[in-house]
């Protein structure tokens, strides 16, 4: 083709365009419309869930639900709908009827869970408030909660409670997943019992919660979360924790707590009280990371960024682990008004076992830290 023959109107076409043949009609089921099961706010949710394994909520709608008990798998796609709890709950309780619930899949996606009243900050958690939750999973495995919002829950927004029976089957199949979710204004974000293990709670955001992770069960990956204006990011004590369940302090705590951002836990934003009452009536003074269990070991602790986020290591098992290291973290605190803000504190009983390696920081208080156990040296040792 010469330049004289080249079309100005169609400069990139050298040959006539071959038209596509007209689409032929087909009775193939893949081309037919599919009726998705949409649950409307005025329908009975329990009856709907009993007859459907998948449910779609109506976009923009608000559902006023409480105490929906199910013993079957379900996938619920919220499409941005709101589910509101009024009074005691929880909204959902899943309880498997099987000893080994290997195929009990539950999925929540893109739902806004909210309680009608904000927690009373000056008050304490009590037995009557523990049911003010969004979802309880009791002996249920393989659950996923993705792209959901949880707001104003006066108890734990999510509770995972598994039995010990799975040990005999050697299945290790809890496999819970919480990802890309937001928790705002909750007393507790996520709680798990002593037999709820091998799960992931990562890439979530927590704002204005008193406790983000109320940790009993071990072997969870709690990484890459953003935690702002919350008094405590991670709490584990050996006895009398809330939401222990029947398994209590069974095989707890150990796992990973890495690459989290923890800002304004004890200064500059948090408005929750530091004092926290346990189930026996005793109280502790929360820190952004608080660990006190002489029978167990803390999680792997690496890459966390603390901006006024204090740490308190009260006790851990020195027979199960000879040394425990905090590595690659950043610690910033210490203002003129609060010179111990953001401090890293280790109890006298375990101070020789704690090492701080490769961390950065300003002149934040390092209380009871052995200078020879820290490289490079950061902060002000007291």
Swiss-Prot record:
Subcellular location: Virion
InterPro entries associated with the record: Adeno_E1B_55kDa (IPR002612), Pectin_lyase_fold/virulence (IPR011050)
Keywords assigned by UniProt, alphabetized: Virion
Signal peptide per UniProt: none
A Pfam family of this chain: Adeno_E1B_55K
Major subcellular site: virion
GO CC annotation: virion component
Keyword hit for Acetylation: no
Transmembrane segments: none
Keyword ATP-binding part of the UniProt annotation: no
Disulfide bonds: none
Family from the record: Belongs to the atadenoviridae LH3 protein family.
Function: Structural component of the virion that presumably stabilizes the groups of hexons but is dispensable for assembly.
Quaternary organization: Homotrimer. Interacts with hexon protein; this interaction tethers the hexons together.
The name this protein goes by in its record: Hexon-interlacing protein LH3
Source organism per UniProt: Ovine adenovirus D serotype 7 (isolate OAV287) (OAdV-7)
Phylogenetic placement of the source organism: Viruses, Varidnaviria, Bamfordvirae, Preplasmiviricota, Tectiliviricetes
């Amino acid at each position: 083709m010469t330049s004289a023959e080249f079309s100005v109107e169609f400069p990139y076409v050298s040959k006539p365009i071959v038209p596509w043949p007209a689409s032929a009609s087909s009775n193939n089921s893949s081309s037919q419309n599919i009726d998705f099961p949409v649950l409307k706010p005025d329908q009975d949710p329990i009856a709907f869930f009993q007859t459907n394994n998948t449910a779609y909520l109506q976009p923009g709608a608000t559902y006023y639900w409480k105490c929906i008990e199910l013993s079957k798998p379900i996938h619920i796609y919220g499409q941005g709908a709101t589910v509101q709890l009024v009074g005691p709950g929880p909204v959902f309780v899943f309880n498997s009827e099987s000893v080994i619930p290997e195929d009990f899949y539950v999925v929540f996606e893109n739902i806004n869970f909210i309680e009608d009243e904000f927690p009373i900050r000056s008050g304490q958690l009590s037995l009557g408030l523990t049911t003010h939750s969004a979802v309880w999973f009791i002996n249920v495995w393989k659950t996923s909660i993705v792209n959901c919002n949880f707001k104003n829950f006066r108890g734990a927004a999510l509770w995972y409670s598994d039995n010990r029976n799975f040990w005999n089957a050697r299945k290790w199949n809890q496999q819970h997943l919480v990802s890309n979710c937001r928790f705002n204004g909750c007393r507790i974000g996520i709680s798990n019992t002593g037999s709820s293990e091998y799960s992931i709670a990562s890439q979530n955001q927590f704002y204005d919660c008193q406790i983000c992770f109320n940790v009993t069960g071990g072997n969870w990956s709690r990484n890459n979360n953003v935690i702002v204006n919350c008094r405590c990011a991670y709490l584990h004590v050996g006895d009398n924790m809330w939401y222990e369940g029947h398994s209590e302090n069974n095989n707890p705590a150990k796992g990973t707590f890495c690459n989290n951002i923890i800002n304004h836990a004890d200064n500059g934003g948090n408005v929750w009280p530091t004092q926290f009452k346990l189930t026996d009536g005793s109280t502790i003074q929360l820190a952004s990371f608080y660990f006190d269990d002489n029978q167990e070991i803390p999680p792997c602790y690496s890459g966390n960024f603390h901006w006024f986020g204090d740490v308190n290591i009260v006790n851990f098992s020195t027979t199960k682990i000879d040394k425990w290291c905090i590595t690659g973290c950043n610690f910033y605190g210490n203002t003129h008004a609060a010179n111990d803000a953001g401090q890293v504190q280790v109890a006298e009983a375990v101070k020789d076992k704690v090492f701080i390696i490769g961390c950065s920081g300003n002149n934040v208080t390092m209380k009871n830290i052995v200078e020879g156990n820290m490289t490079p040296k950061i902060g002000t040792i007291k």
